[in-house]
Swiss-Prot record:
It comes from the Bacteria. Belongs to the FPG family. CDD domains: EcFpg-like_N (cd08966). Keywords: DNA damage, DNA repair, DNA-binding, Glycosidase, Hydrolase, Lyase, Metal-binding, Multifunctional enzyme, Zinc, Zinc-finger. Involved in base excision repair of DNA damaged by oxidation or by mutagenic agents. Acts as a DNA glycosylase that recognizes and removes damaged bases. Has a preference for oxidized purines, such as 7,8-dihydro-8-oxoguanine (8-oxoG). Has AP (apurinic/apyrimidinic) lyase activity and introduces nicks in the DNA strand. Cleaves the DNA backbone by beta-delta elimination to generate a single-strand break at the site of the removed base with both 3'- and 5'-phosphates. A zinc finger (FPG-type) spans 247-281. DNA binds at H96, R115, K161. The gene is mutM. This is Formamidopyrimidine-DNA glycosylase.
């Protein structure tokens, strides 16, 4: 699933190429693409047609378009393979095109999703801490790239967590935007093993970790995000290249860029964790009461 940098790349593209355009027509080409919109395709088409895309917004890994004058959010779930592409209408339809918007700018806004895990839904906007969010996103915490991110408050929350630190920073209600890739990269930079218990870490160490998350995601954003295959692209269909700069994630048996020890892979939930056994020693006590 795309993480914060990849979603932000898409958001910026939509802000540049779709915002300000009115929606003239809507085609829903696959029912799974709107399964989260429980009122169905006719309702979604009716709510979208005639609306203007006022802005493209993001919180963590969640993306939405603000529509006016209705004042609602079109929530875009990218899933594992979702793409938002701005195309001239003369370009042939993509094989896995699921939804197409015809804009008054003369362009198409196309939702392409090979694996059909993603989709669109319309949600009312609600105010949370001075920010308007789709109701379905209201429970999501601010992310480290958010100008209003309160580092000390998050440190305090993490200090109260009796769980592995990696699991804690993947909790989108604590801090959003961090997924498996950037969790491993941030933990590597802060020299923390993901199995360390959050409450056992000092406040300075937690600040270091969250600062590392901000830095690594900022660097990834500058490089267009991380693309392991052709499915993670921006609105112009271009892939990012931060995967070439990864220090830990996916680097099993390669030398740690800091100390030279081979990076190791461990099972974590239904995924994998990558870390340096020398820079990030495994904690002695891993059990949680």
């Amino acid at each position: 699933m795309p993480e914060l940098p990849e979603v932000e790349v898409v958001r910026r593209g939509l802000q540049s190429h779709a915002v300000g355009a009115a929606i003239e027509a809507v085609e829903v080409l696959h029912p799974r693409a709107i399964r989260r919109h429980i009122l169905g395709s006719e309702d979604l088409i009716g709510q979208l047609t005639g609306q203007t895309i006022a802005s493209a917004e993001r919180r963590g890994k969640y993306l939405w378009l603000v529509l006016e004058p209705a004042g609602v959010g079109l929530v875009v779930h990218l899933g594992m393979s979702g793409q938002m592409l701005v195309q001239p209408p003369t370009v042939d339809w993509e094989k896995h095109l699921r939804i197409r918007l015809a804009l008054d700018s003369g362009a198409d806004l196309r939702f392409v999703d090979q694996r059909t895990f993603g989709g669109w839904s319309i949600s009312p906007l609600v105010e949370v801490d001075g920010t308007m969010l789709p109701e379905s996103v209201a429970h999501i915490a601010r992310d480290p790239m958010d100008a209003a991110f309160d580092l000390e408050s998050v440190v305090k929350v993490l200090r109260g967590k009796h769980t592995e630190i990696k699991r804690a920073i993947l909790d989108q209600t604590v801090v959003s935007g961090i997924g498996n890739i950037y969790a491993d990269e941030s933990l590597w930079r802060a020299k923390i093993h993901g199995n360390r218990i959050a409450e056992s870490l000092t406040r300075p160490k937690l600040r270091e970790l969250l600062t590392a998350a901000h830095s690594v995601m900022g660097e990834a954003l500058d490089q267009g995000g991380t693309s392991f295959d052709a499915l993670y692209v921006n609105v112009n269909g271009e892939s990012g290249y931060f995967d070439r700069s990864l220090s830990a994630y996916g680097q099993e048996n390669l030398p740690c860029p800091r100390c030279g020890a081979p990076i190791k892979r461990e099972k974590f939930m239904n995924r994998s964790s990558f870390s340096c056994p020398r820079c990030q020693p495994t904690p002695r006590a891993r059990r949680i009461a």
